[in-house]
Amino acid sequence: VAGMNGASVVSIAIIILYGFTLFTFLNTVLILPTRDFGRKITIDIKRKGNKKEFTILPIKNIKRYSLVILIISIGYLGTVVGFFDYVFNSFRNTDLFKNYYVNPEEVDIEFPDKKQNLIYIFMESTEMTNVSKKNGGVFDISITPNLENIALNNINFSNTELLGGARESYGTSWTVAAMIAQTAGIPLKVKLDDVSSNNSTSFNNITTLGDILSSNGYNNYLLMGSDANFGGRRAYFSNHNYIISDYYTAVEDGKIDSDYHEWWGYEDSKLFTYAKEYLIKLANDGKPFNFTMLTADTHFTDGYLDKSCSNVFSEAYANSFYCSDSMIADFISWIQEQDFYENTTIVLTGDHPTMQD
């Protein structure tokens, strides 16, 4: 299925089931009113002694019925799905990038003599609505209590006085687009027939975070437990001076068997174990490093619950976030115990808002 490489069999099966169920329901609802089952539903209207009968069901004027359904469908598509906004914005020019985009090639970026290491953690589908209501979320009890505590006690970029975040713009609402937006300052806007092409994400003419750090002596490393080729992630990061370790790297290095496949590749518990190994190697290399990683357990549908975690909430997705929150907190605690921590900045960010209600 196009765009679904690396997805779990369960996720694909659920999507197919939802699609089939919706298709069956809509067709049943739309076709039933036109069928004659030997019974009619009518309305009798009396006026000035005359009686007129109107047949409601079955519908005889199929063309008129089809036109009404078409108008309703267009209205739904335009308002609920946002098609009208999409069409309107497609023909509108914006000065956003003209006014706010800064070309790194045109400014002087100065680094201190002792350069800070950077650990950049992209957390799949993680947003601040996961925290407790008292701090800006939507839950009575936070499903990411550790991340909530970290945000409260460290620097947090918010759009409110409470815990909040950024509003995603066009071209930043899926993983590779979000990673490009956060490391290059631009959205991923490609043609539909080019969306899965590696050429669409190369951005050879753009100076990115990886380029800036590499030119200043940093080692850039990207770790993920899925296939880096998916969505053009390998093309983008390898083109901008990152060494990449993904699912297939783990197979090649003998960390997992070639027939091992859990969720999107291998689960986050292994991801954090491998991250510790790579960080120790990078720290011992003697050069400043930028270690970027991407989690996956909290991807929809319903996320993945690691075997080390238990069900705390009634919703499966909430349990997935709660489990991921615990693993991230443990990982950060481990980092804080390392010698390189005092000279390291940690960035925790969701790649994009959740795709599941």
Locations of the language-model features?
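Arginine residue identity/basic-tract feature
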Residues: 35, 39, 47, 64, ...
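Transmembrane and membrane-interface helices of multi-pass
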Residues: 1-90
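Short extracytoplasmic/periplasmic juxtamembrane "stem" segments immediately C-terminal to an N-terminal membrane anchor
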Residues: 91-110
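Residues that form generic nucleotide/phosphate-binding pockets
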Residues: 44, 96-100, 150, 278
